[in-house]
């Protein structure tokens, strides 16, 4: 339901008092019908629930993280994304129902929410137990040639040629110079199956042909790995504490139950109350998820 249609459903509103009618109240602030109209003009393609959620999030997260997410930070992020997309930026925004003018406030809300999530992770998730769990599967940086082929036959032929003799190995390394990469177990650019095989290799060793199917495209690739410089993590977990924290951070950012719990925490902290019955279930996806996870 989009803003224009939903606003008609607001109950008990005459033309004279509808603009000042409260939709959502919270500590020290409120969201009125007039605020929703204003937001709908800026984001005409966004569903009403999304508009109201973002209005609420912007207000409650600004209280705690407004000083962290500055206008300069937002502008820098917007520029970075714009540069990344180049000439496709406008069309990418259109697909999301955004314009260049509305993208900045949209990004600000996203960054405020991210700041709240990251704060909660830092305060509650970097425990000894979580660090030890991350440590179990962590492998530090290695450097290797990681070469992919589109068929198993091509990969097998390339591997056989590389392993045949020193000349074959030298030719393999010269041909695939751009495929020489440094990665660890947190890297997203190297498939998990390839990492698992690579971490078992000694310097100068080749892997067998490794099959990996992309979860995003469904395409299967066939990899060959030659280890250049392996590493051992040893027994000192503290040496890699920052890397392990990043493992935990990435995991929690992708955990929808955790993220919903963070949002629910701030909704409760700010006593956010939906006054208009048409939007009674506006935040249920966060509060119900939080309740179910805490009761387990």
Say what each PLM segment does.
Residues 42-56, 68-72, 83, 101-111, ...:
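Soluble non-cytosolic domains of exported or imported proteins
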Residues 1-53, 150-151, 164, 189-193, ...:
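Short, low-structural-confidence N-terminal segments
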Residues 158-200, 238-239:
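Peptidyl-prolyl cis-trans isomerase
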Residues 115-144:
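Acidic/polar surface patches and capping/hinge elements
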Residues 225-241:
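C-terminal soluble interaction/assembly domains
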